[in-house]
Amino acid sequence: MFASLTSEQKLLLKKYKFNNYVKTIELSQAQLAHWRSNKDIQPKPLDRAEILRVEKATRGQSKNELWTLLRLDRNTASASSNSSGNMLQRPALLFGNAQESHVKETNGIMLDHMREIIESKIMSAVVETVLDCGMFFSPLGLHAASPDAYFSLADGTWIPVEIKCPYNYRDTTVEQMRVELGNGNRKYRVKHTALLVNKKGTPQFEMVKTDAHYKQMQRQMYVMNAPMGFYVVKFKQNLVVVSVPRDETFCNKELSTENNAYVAFAVENSNCARYQCADKRRLSFKTHSCNHNYSGQEIDAMVDRGIYLDYGHLKCAYCDFSSDSRETCDSVLKREHTNCKSFNLKHKNFDNPTYFDYVKRLQSLLKSHHFRNDAKTLAYFGYYLTHTGTLKTFCCGSQNSSPTKHDHLNDCVYYLEIK
């Protein structure tokens, strides 16, 4: 599986596959306080170097397996379906992809013109033109964009280029298209594009803000934090290039949407960590007593299985299991948990079952100034702080003085599940 991926791409897939990435999201108290007062996450989790690392590893786009895999479930600028089953679109898609490459490779004058526009508007020199563009992540990592090309400026700015090659205009020039427009209006929409053009005189093009292509470009500018972009449409013998300014209102809405989603994932992850303590899971049934009819014995059975109650939804603190609290206890307990790390093991198999709960291990480690900075990682790997101030695993009883090395017995069931 994933045979075409390099070792670097496999690392990126493991880290940034959407379902993996969102489970790592957490907020510090400072970040949470900043979000509450400013509705913005600072600092952002992804820096420029990491964003470019992903972009370079996903070049080739649809020909690159990593690009396809990272798009799954992620909010992309095109907002298109991840799987296209419409066979009627295939000729148009194949034509468009081939023509986009041709446009980039054979139109140096167009690119020179774009550079002149950029440098006159932004007052910063273009230092690199990337024609084989991969996928850009936003600094929060939830949204992504894959323009057809981009310019990199001396001041660090990125400018996206989106190229459209409508199949319908493969044999139609701009003037032929204008002739076919009506006569009652001064301007007309150009079908299959986001363009608006005047009927008479020298053609003057502008973008329609309600069109999907306009929104796609604005999402690209949001993800890349670009002040502008270029929208290119190919006709038979013509290229139409429109410079598109950043729509701050649109981008602010995108920012708000992504910030809220990021916080929601962080809260969900925080809940999962909190509910890895059995007492917290049991308390959840008491807190939400109006949302269930389970007996005390049934609650104990579900708590032992790692389940807690969250506003009418039964969830597992160790995996993605979810169920409605109206479901019977027997039915809930019979359902399978996929990739669950609760293991449902008997405590007698552990060296010190008192520290089976992650939270208890974490609390013990936080008492040590020496291990405090690595407490979360150590607790995850099963370590707790003994009364003598040393590290020991609750599962197989291994002791270790180095917080960066995780030594468990070869047959340790807990470590075999989490490593």
UniProtKB/Swiss-Prot annotation:
GO terms for cellular component: host cell nucleus. It holds the Pfam family Viral_alk_exo. Its EC number is 3.1.-.-. The keyword DNA-binding does not apply. The keyword Ion transport does not apply. Keywords: Endonuclease, Exonuclease, Host nucleus, Hydrolase, Late protein, Nuclease. InterPro entries: NF-kappa-B_Signaling_Reg, PDDEXK-like_dom_sf, Restrct_endonuc-II-like, Viral_alk_exo. This is Alkaline nuclease. It comes from Autographa californica nuclear polyhedrosis virus. The gene is AN.
